[in-house]
Amino acid sequence: PKMYPGSRYANRMPIGSIDVIENFKPDELRAYYKKWYRPDLQAIIIVGDVNVDQVEATIKKMFADVPAPVNPAKREQVSVPDNDLPLISIAKDKEASNTILYIFYKHDKLPNDLNRTIAGLVKDYIQQICASIMDERFDDILHQANPPFIYAQAYDDDNFMIAKSKGAWTVAALAKEGEIDSTLTTLVKETQRVKQYGFTPSEYERARINVLKQYESAYNERNNQKNDAYVREYVNHFTNGGYIPGIEMEYTLLNQIAQNIPVEQVNQYIQDMIGEDNIVIGLTGPDKEGIKYPTEENLLRTFLKARQMPVEPYKETVSNEPLVPTLPTPGRITETKTGQRFGATVFTLSNGIKVVLKPTEFKKDEIIMTATSPGGSTLFGTKDIDNLKVFNDVIEIGGLGNFSATDLSKRLAGKKVSCALSLSQDSENVNGMAAPSDLRTLFELIYLSFTAPRMDEEAYASFETRTKAQLQNMELNPMVAFSDSLSKAVYGDNPRASRLRPQDFEHISYPRIMEMRKERFSDASGFVFTFVGNIQIDSIRPYIEQYLATLPSQGKIEKGNPAEVPSTRKGDYMNRFNRSMEIPKVTVANLYTGQMEYNLENIITATALKQVMDLVYYEKVREKEGGTYGVGVSARISPFPEGRTTLQIFFDTDPAKWEQMNTIVRNELKLSLIH
């Protein structure tokens, strides 16, 4: 009612009401089906390796006798009236764990007859540019010491939430508890900064080449597109309209568009979108004692006040210096083995590192890199358990070399490349990918990850405050409470199995985490790098010699400590707890653990068991009993600790049915194991 006054949506959402579900008459459903499920509103989409003529003939034969309706009901879009003053909506939910603030700037949509032409592509290009630059500015704020929000973004998806008759330029943020006003003020000021001064040429250039890179990658992979991607595009075209020329034509047109649209045209568009009227402000958050929310009047007052605050033009400094300013003397490839397993080539380098190369033709525009070394988090003692909880999130927030994380992101504009370090229980890992044209950059990032980690206390302070704010109300989510209960039931009070909580930051040390990173990643001994994809071995050799053969290597290789992995509870154990919910349901998890030899036969057997039980439960529990939307099954044999087995079966169901459904689940498992 608050967001859609004067519209049908003010009284009822498109999904309907619970009253209809609980009290409908069968004839009403039949009448609805007859009214709307009809040939002129339906489409059949088939994508795959099929005989087109045969499939078309089959479709015509099967559906030819479906009659066209006489005097069919007209499908109309629900209109959304304009508003002069900002509309305010505040909603609280007992199960919500985040406070989310939205500002919608409603606008008319591009008419359908234009949206299906090149005008629609131009509009989408400009919208993508605007959203990309705004998100980059929000990211800069997030890396400051104490940002008012946890996350923020801007977008325009041509719909005003559920309403397809209006579009809306949308700015949204996850606000920290107690900082709703400051979050709203920041969003408004950044929006006004764009309205008054627009985007800078350098911002536009970065966004432009990033968009072009995305289209270039899609074009290069045009022959490797999956069937479901085509289906999604056709469904979207049928339901929402627009253009669908194919990636070849779209890529050609977009290159022309990007070269001919100046930053001034982009600025004019976004400044027109940020209007003085047709504004809606939405606020949702936890219904929890102690959380104070502004009144609608106060929220409006904050918005209007922020809109009048003076703002300065956006300023930034962007470095174009080399990622690796001083290159080391290249190392050597001391041994080459060709024709290895799966047709791979294996290099041994002068520093002892091994490199596995496997050229493939599955994707033209992608090279995948993984690197692992034995060791892992289990080599750290009890005093570092809390540090380990955030280790993978924290070790790269400072950036690399001479670049902060935000500066590095800007420096990599227009490149399809990524590289990330992580620590698992028994290994150190480096994962990355690149387009063949950006392969050198991937090697530079690998080299910097080992040799030039960068600390940024301000970025860490931001991470800590945002993470603590996000964790503050996690327990309000019933599924988080269930996960906590399940973890305790399986692992007891083992601190290595507990999730991160706000109070853990009292024992977390950023300097210590960076020391831990150095302990595990400053020595590349034991690492095996594997590159798979569109590789030319002669072209990649110089990069291997320059960037991998020069990594520091002291010859020290360690193995993870399986004794530090939390052990599972022995024997039968049931943990049942109640939690009040607005929409009652029961979540059931059956967990079975054991031990078996870790080998390929047993791994395949476990996979087969999971797939068989998926089919059995779909038929018996979902289709026959109507007891759940689906039963999830996972079956795993762990390589570390070696041979530990876990079979987990979980489902949601009606409180009145859970015991009956769980009996079926357990009985069907027993029958499957017998056979």
What are these regions (language model features)?
Residues 33, 420-421, 517:
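Conserved, carboxylate-rich catalytic/transport cores that coordinate ions
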Residues 1, 9-12, 16-28, 32-39, ...:
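Hydrophobic, small-residue-rich alpha-helical packing segments that form membrane-like cores
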Residues 43, 51-139, 143-145, 205-209, ...:
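Proteolytic maturation boundary segments
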Residues 37, 521-522:
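Flexible, low-complexity linker/tail segments at the boundary of structured domains
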Residues 1-19, 41-47, 97-118, 138-260, ...:
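M16 family metallopeptidases and their MPP-like homologs
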Residues 456-460, 557:
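Conserved short beta-strand edge segments in small beta-sheet-based binding/regulatory domains
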Residues 613-614:
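Short Ser/Thr-interspersed hydrophobic loop/turn segments at strand-loop and sheet-helix junctions
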